Amino acid sequence: MDRNNVLVLGPPKSGKIRFAQFISGDYETETISDDSHSGLMYKCNLKTKYFSVDVNLLIEEFPESRKEPEEKWISSLQTWFGEFESDTMADLREVIEGVVFTVCVNEWDDNVIKQQLDILSNMKDLLKDNDPFFIVMGVSEHDIEQDTMADLEDLVLLNGFEFVYFNDSGMNEFRDKMGKDRLLEVLETHEWTQKHLTHVSNEDYMAYKKEKMTSMTQGLLQEDDCNIPTLDVLLQKLQIEKSKVEEMKENERKGYVDGLVDEFLEYF
């Protein structure tokens, strides 16, 4: 079975197709069923200066039918996960290298989100040997109040996942990429099992990885002395970095964490 697979999972109208179309550039809609998006696959080729990689975006939707009422979505997700963790799905699980869980943030319920994140945590434990990345991606059909978005992001972070709001783009106050730009960055910086180096030496590729990692944390503690971040801001940033570290391979974590510690100590 092909490797380099990303599972894109979520309920109806939560952005699964929008994510897949953005990453793949495939906006054809004739093959998309009105009843369910499960089973769709988008193929894409990601290219950077140093490598290219073929990636499959595997779409799964719960419940099985869009006619099911929303109050049954949690039980439908539990049923889906029960099938996913079964022996018959072992071959598929072995080739999953990333999971994008999609949610609609127009009207979200703390209790529902928590139950979904609990199931996602079980999935993370199930796939831990693959060392996949996990992203919770939110979409909205209208503007969301900043406080509401911050509450949702905090809830996701406290459960050990990174939250990305699809409608965003550009960079935040920490100079971290946001929204679509962050989603693309996650895929471009992941250590894919099968990739093709673009006529560069391994040393150049390792230098590229180091440069990418540095740029992802640029601005963490680079403010002028007159504009030192507050403790709340630093704690929020620490939560974001914790989520990033959890997605790294074991041999990458120590150096990255050591660098973070040194930078944080400059403030104390």
From Swiss-Prot:
Keywords: Chromosomal rearrangement. GO terms for molecular function: protein-macromolecule adaptor activity. The keyword Mitochondrion does not apply. Transmembrane segments: none annotated. It comes from the Eukaryota. Signal peptide: none annotated. The keyword Lipid metabolism does not apply. Gene3D superfamilies: 3.40.50.11960. Belongs to the IRC6 family. Involved in gross chromosomal rearrangements (GCRs) and telomere healing. This is Increased recombination centers protein 6. It comes from Clavispora lusitaniae (strain ATCC 42720) (Yeast).
